[in-house]
């Protein structure tokens, strides 16, 4: 089932509101979860930057399947679980540094996260684009949906 217009709006609103997500990658033995800044494209592709020597980057090169969790627990009502959250699963790909795609996605990333600008001066910086294929969304306990993208 694909996302309908209302579901797209809900997912887009959550992604636009949040600046950090939990990126889960599969290592040789253990999964690894990292909280870090992200940005999203209008098509819901998720963008992350990281060092080329980071475990998460190396994990994604070997095992490109990734899960990303985005939520608003910082402003949600924890006692009643009124938290908007979504996990997205997809395939990660490396964005070639210096390419037109890199420059285009860098602009999207920095528009959302201008505080990340200094990292782009590091020659070891890498950018990953995750093209989601599945999403599970919930706002509280009743407003939920799952979809294939």
How should each PLM-predicted stretch be described?
Residues 1-21:
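Extreme N-terminal tail/first-helix region
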Residues 4-9, 56, 111-114:
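Charged, amphipathic alpha-helical segments
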Residues 17-18, 63, 133:
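Structured helix-beta-strand junction loops
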Residues 18-52, 60, 68-72, 79-80:
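Short beta-strand segments
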Residues 22-26, 76, 114-122:
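Short helix-to-loop capping/linker segments positioned immediately adjacent to catalytic or ligand/cofactor-binding
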Residues 51-54, 69-75, 106-116:
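Short acidic (Asp/Glu) patches
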Residues 57-63, 80, 147-149:
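A short, polar/proline- and glycine-enriched secondary-structure boundary/capping micro-motif
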